[in-house]
């Protein structure tokens, strides 16, 4: 979840997961293991997934019965790399009612992301190990500290360096996130760090 409505995160596949798992067991606070169903929507008047890179996402999330609606607006460099997102999220009482509202407003479902997420807290990071149906296992690291004066690109580099320092080896980051990878696998772009 974003801090101050800003989200700075990396989403990577790591060459070696064991060093991270061992580090988290010894040094981080385990928070939860959840089954998350993320359903993404696009309004008829503005097709979010037609633009490249995809800038906006509208998501309904069901986390073992706890439901949220989230809107993300990504900011990109001139090279098309995401720096951070404006994120607005609120809890819902009934995800099926929210789905009906969105569909009544002519928002069409575009993709479902089905994942098991294990989450830890370490210092200013939320670290998640994700198993997404149809994709490789991934690691997501989100910065949850003070946002005053933070350079998103520097913070993302710091997160990658953290994973390398504990022995994860090469990192492969994707530019579009899980929803994009499932929707457009042929357009997936990865960067090795």
Predicted regions located by residue number:
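Short, intrinsically disordered/low-complexity patches at protein termini
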Residues: 93-94, 135, 163
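Residues forming anionic-ligand binding surfaces in small-molecule and nucleic-acid pockets
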Residues: 72-75, 134-142
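Short, flexible turn/loop "capping" segments at secondary-structure junctions
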Residues: 1-4, 133-137
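N-terminal strand-loop-strand beta-hairpin
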Residues: 1-124, 168-193
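An amphipathic alpha-helical core segment
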Residues: 126-134, 143-146
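Active-site ExK catalytic segment of metal-dependent nucleases
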Residues: 9-11, 140-144
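Mixed-charge, glycine-accented linear interaction segment located at domain edges/termini
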Residues: 148-177
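General beta-strand recognition
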Residues: 68-70, 128, 140
């Amino acid at each position: 979840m974003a801090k101050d409505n800003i989200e700075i995160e990396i989403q990577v596949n790591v060459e070696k997961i064991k060093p991270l798992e061992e580090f988290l067991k010894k040094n981080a606070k385990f928070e939860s293991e959840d089954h998350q169903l993320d359903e993404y929507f696009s309004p008829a008047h503005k097709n979010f997934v037609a633009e490249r890179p995809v800038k906006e996402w509208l998501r309904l999330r069901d986390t073992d019965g706890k439901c949220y609606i989230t809107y993300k607006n990504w900011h990109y460099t001139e090279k098309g790399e995401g720096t951070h997102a404006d994120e607005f999220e609120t809890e819902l009482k009934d995800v099926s009612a929210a789905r009906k509202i969105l569909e009544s407003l002519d928002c069409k479902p575009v993709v479902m992301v089905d994942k098991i997420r294990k989450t830890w807290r370490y210092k200013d990071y939320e670290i998640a190990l994700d198993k997404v149906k149809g994709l490789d296992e991934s690691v997501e690291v989100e910065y949850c500290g003070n946002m005053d004066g933070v350079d998103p690109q520097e913070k993302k580099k710091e997160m990658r360096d953290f994973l390398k320092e504990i022995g994860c080896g090469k990192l492969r980051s994707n530019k579009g996130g899980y929803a994009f990878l499932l929707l457009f696998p042929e357009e997936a772009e990865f960067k090795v760090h």
